[in-house]
């Protein structure tokens, strides 16, 4: 039997215009028109660690993610954590926590991330460099492992980043991955043995123009499956207290 799935993203597009203090802004300057400064930096060339940091450093992305998780705007966040959350002699995944949100020390939300790079070569053709689509299994192992460690809520997050200037025929917000590429990623992910308690999030980050994505871009977030909260282990709560006491929030 064929079951059709419908998922819904919430998105935000952003564009910036820089001018020195006191300068008059030219009223003819058009936002979302791709006329900003050209950068040779592509979002698809950033490391996974860099792009996870981008999620929390970039206001539209951070706000969307916190809203989907139903968390306050001032929630503590940190990326790429090992000590003190992961025991040094641990031999099973995860080796680190890609992203953590802590609204309360007794409610730590651990998120494991797998990024997928998509390059729009033409209006209708995508390219996914490397053998990325086969790496979802590792993401699920890490997210299931976070649950085993004892965090309150655990998520697998599939992050799809797209470099889309070649889709200039489309409007600013429509230059992301093609529906066909996303369907493949979605169904491969849903076929994985993710634990019933572990949630699933999809995030799309698109660089629609040749301007740096820090200044101009689009981000979309879909909470496909909310995590089921668990009783957080006392040991993890103690480690989380140690983390938030000694490390600054992002």
Label each region the model flagged:
Residues 121, 133-134:
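SAM-dependent methyltransferase catalytic-core segment centered on the flexible catalytic loop
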């Amino acid at each position: 039997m064929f079951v059709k799935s419908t998922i819904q993203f919430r998105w935000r597009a952003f564009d910036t215009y820089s001018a020195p203090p006191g300068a008059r802004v030219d009223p003819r300057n058009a936002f979302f028109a791709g006329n900003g400064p050209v950068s040779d930096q592509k979002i698809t060339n950033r490391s996974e660690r860099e792009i996870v940091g981008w999620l929390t450093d970039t206001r539209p992305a951070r706000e969307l993610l916190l809203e989907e998780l139903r968390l306050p705007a001032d929630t503590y966040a940190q990326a790429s954590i090992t000590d003190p959350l992961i025991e040094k002699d641990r031999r099973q995944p995860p080796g680190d926590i890609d992203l953590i949100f802590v609204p309360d020390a007794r409610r730590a939300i651990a998120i494991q991330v797998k990024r997928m790079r998509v390059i729009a070569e033409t209006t209708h053709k995508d390219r996914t460099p490397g053998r990325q689509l086969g790496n979802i299994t590792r993401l699920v192992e890490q997210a299931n492992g976070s649950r085993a460690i004892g965090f309150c809520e655990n998520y697998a997050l599939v992050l799809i980043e797209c470099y889309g200037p070649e889709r200039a025929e489309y409007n600013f917000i429509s230059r992301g991955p093609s529906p066909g590429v996303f369907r493949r990623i979605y169904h491969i992910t849903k076929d994985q043995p993710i634990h019933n308690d572990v949630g699933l999030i999809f995030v799309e980050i698109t660089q629609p123009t040749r301007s740096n994505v820090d200044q101009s871009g689009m981000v979309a977030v879909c909470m496909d499956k909310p995590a089921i909260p668990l009783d957080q282990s006392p040991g993890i709560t103690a480690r989380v207290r140690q983390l938030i006491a000694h490390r600054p929030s992002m």
